[in-house]
Amino acid sequence: MEQVEKFLKEADVYYLATMEGDQPRVRPFGTAHIFEGKLYIQTGKVKGVYKQLKENPKAEICACIKDQWLRVSGELIEDDRREARQSMLDDYPSLQSMYSADDGNTAVFYFQNATAVFSSFQAELEVIKF
C-alpha cells in the first residue's frame, strides 16, 4: 500500500471516478494518505463526490507518471473520526486554509477491498490488494 501512496503523491494529481445514478463522474484529486494502515483520500461534504460515495461507495482512481499508470478500485468508506481528518490535514498543510478537522465539511474516506494495478507498456502488471 505504501507503494500506491508513493505513486499517487509523485503523480500529484489522480482522477477519481464515481457513479451518479447510471452516469459516471470523474474529477481530479490530489490527496493520498496512509492512516492506521489504510489508504485515505479527502473531500468536502458539500461536494457532489461526497454524496455519490455515500450512495455508492464503489470507486476507481487512475494516475499516470510518464509511461506508467496506476488504477486503484475498491470501496471508499467514510471515517468520521476527528483524528482521521486531522491526520490528513497534517499531511496536507495547504488544505488547512480551506478545511479544518472540526468544520463540519471535511470528509475522509479509506479504501476497503481495494485492488491496485500498476501498468506500463514495458513491464508486467503488478497487482496489490489491500
Say what each PLM segment does.
Residues 71-130:
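Charged, gly/pro-rich active-site loop segments
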Residues 6-20, 59-61:
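A short, Trp-centered hydrophobic/proline-enriched beta-strand micro-motif
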Residues 32-66:
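A short mixed-secondary-structure module that forms the rim of ligand-binding clefts
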Residues 11-13, 37-39, 56-59, 104-106, ...:
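Short, surface-exposed beta-edge/turn micro-motifs
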Residues 15, 39-40, 71, 117:
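General beta-strand recognition
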